[in-house]
Regions:
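Anion-binding alpha/beta catalytic cores of soluble intermediary-metabolism enzymes, centered on
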Residues: 1-191
Length: 191
């Protein structure tokens, strides 16, 4: 079953809570969840959407980055996964504005994230995931020589295939969710 741990909210008037109080509460809750999971008492935790301004965005962009910092992950290999038994979705970039995504992706980042994802599936589900990687541009930038699909994404996929990852792509992001993709466990987008 689902175990719920209450983190007491000690505000006299919860409708007049200051930003500072809310921030302390959110960080306390996330830290408690992290500590419990780090002690192998639980396999993971679920969080609801959090106002990113409460995490001191100068240092931490979101929960994914908060957990990476707590786990001393400095190589940007952490993965945010939205998961259910039928399909998981993973963005390569997290908490980055759309106009910065193209400049934020690179071959090494894609490789790091997908190796982490693959290892996670092997550890948690005892199997190799079938991974679909999406392109960045509409229609995959028509796979033109200067597109991110040709310069960055495809070389990363080819390198991962050499490492024996079960991976396909880049597929067109425009239409990937129109039909049911039962042949994939995970769809990986650039954002």
């Amino acid at each position: 079953g689902l175990k719920i741990i209450d983190v007491p909210l000690k505000f006299k008037n919860p409708f007049k809570v200051s930003h500072k109080e809310s921030s302390k509460y959110v960080i306390k809750s996330l830290s408690l969840a992290h500590n419990i999971c780090s002690g192998n008492k639980f396999n993971g935790f679920i969080n609801c959407p959090i106002d990113k301004k409460l995490l001191d965005s100068r240092y931490i962009a979101g929960v994914t980055e908060f957990l990476a910092k707590k786990n001393r992950i400095k190589d940007n290999s952490e993965v945010m996964m939205i998961y259910n038994q039928k399909l998981a979705v993973v963005p390569i970039t997290t908490h980055v504005s759309l106009k910065k995504v193209a400049a934020s992706i690179n071959r090494n980042l894609i490789i790091k994230k997908l190796v982490t994802l693959n290892n996670c599936y092997r550890k948690l589900f005892k199997r190799e995931p079938k991974i679909c990687v999406l392109g960045l541009n509409p229609h995959n930038g028509e796979m033109l020589k200067k597109s991110e699909e040709v310069k960055i994404i495809l070389p990363a996929i080819n390198q991962l295939k050499k490492k024996k990852l079960n991976i396909k792509g880049p597929l067109v992001a425009d239409t990937i969710f129109i039909r049911k993709h039962k042949e994939f466990d995970v769809i990986v987008g650039m954002y």
